[in-house]
Amino acid sequence: MNETLTVIIIIGAFLLAGSIKGIIGLGLPTVSLGLLTATLDLTTAMVLLLIPSFITNIWQATVGGNGKFIIKRIWPFLCLATVTIWLGSTVLTITNPLYLSILLGALLFVYSTLNLLGFRLSISPKHEKWSGPLLGAVNGILTGMTGSFVVPGVMYLQAIGLPRDKLVQAMVMLFSLSTIGLAFALQNNNLLTTELATISAFAVVPSIIGMVVGQKIRKSLSETRFRRIFFVSILVLGAFIIAKSGLAL
């Protein structure tokens, strides 16, 4: 693939991902990771999403006035989801990336299918003490292996019954901490090169432009309908990644 086409793909991926985040408040890491894995490769996609994901999440994580409540309730989950990323990234260095791309596709497929079906787990407060650290650790390992932050982490945050505003802020906290953990893990395994880090920094620009556009579109679009389109698209993207990687084995 020539450099011009690669640049166009990267800009397009982050413009689209930023637009989706502007419309529904979430989705930049998931969309950019899926698109770049489908067109480039998994490791490159994981590195490129780091800075745009962090920059677009950090402000969202600190507003809303619920930070102390959220941290007090889910800090064991957040800690394990962050510190176990290095373990998953170690697997990334010794495993055929095509297998991990298939795993990523499967995670995206499952995540979108469950949301389309309206499936929700329910975890009572008395079970949060053990389920939070357990699912946090699983989420961290899968993040290190695939770059995806959403399964089972987002499902856990939905399952403990957080109100919408607190749920969104908790998810953004998870994504922000996971981005930091992933950056350190990739650097430790010599996968975070200066060249890719520079490109990731430049990718902030189309991400922010996309967010601004998405926020304007949001005013004239049904969020419910868009979410359905979003999850159907992620489902198709996950299936495509599975098929493409499977055929390449």
Annotate each PLM feature:
Residues 1-39, 122-171:
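Selected transmembrane alpha-helices and immediately adjacent juxtamembrane segments
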Residues 71-72, 94-108, 118-121, 220, ...:
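Loop-to-transmembrane alpha-helix entry segments
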Residues 6-7, 37-54, 98-108, 137-147, ...:
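Structural signature of hydrophobic alpha-helical transmembrane segments
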Residues 39-42, 64-70, 158-166, 189-193:
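Juxtamembrane helix-boundary/capping and inter-helix hinge elements in multi-pass membrane proteins
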Residues 12, 16, 51-58, 75, ...:
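Hydrophobic residues within alpha-helical transmembrane segments
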Residues 57-67, 89, 103-127, 215-216, ...:
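Transmembrane helix exit motif
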Residues 45, 87-88, 141-148, 182, ...:
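Hydrophobic alpha-helical transmembrane segments in multi-pass integral membrane proteins
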Residues 48-97, 180-223:
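Selective hydrophobic functional segments
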